[in-house]
């Protein structure tokens, strides 16, 4: 099974139409990967579906980089 980081990067690549090799953990969805506000909403929805968790809007707004998405999922999967 893929680890969380690999799964998050795969989702980001699919949602934003970027090559997985271009995605680094410090990549910003908007500044580095060209996402707009709709992309980020769809990305959060894809993460929720993949990891079967709910990400409240106020938390989703704080997730702006790949690493923040990985950290959020990691923290909330263990609960």
From Swiss-Prot:
Organism lineage: Bacteria, Pseudomonadati, Pseudomonadota, Betaproteobacteria, Rhodocyclales
GO biological process, one term: lipid A biosynthetic process
Keyword Lipid biosynthesis listed: yes
Signal sequence, renumbered to the chain: none
Record-given protein name: Acyl carrier protein
InterPro entries hit by this protein: ACP, ACP-like_sf, PP-bd_ACP, Ppantetheine_attach_site
Organism: Aromatoleum aromaticum (strain DSM 19018 / LMG 30748 / EbN1)
Major subcellular location class: cytoplasm
Ranges for domain Carrier: 2-77
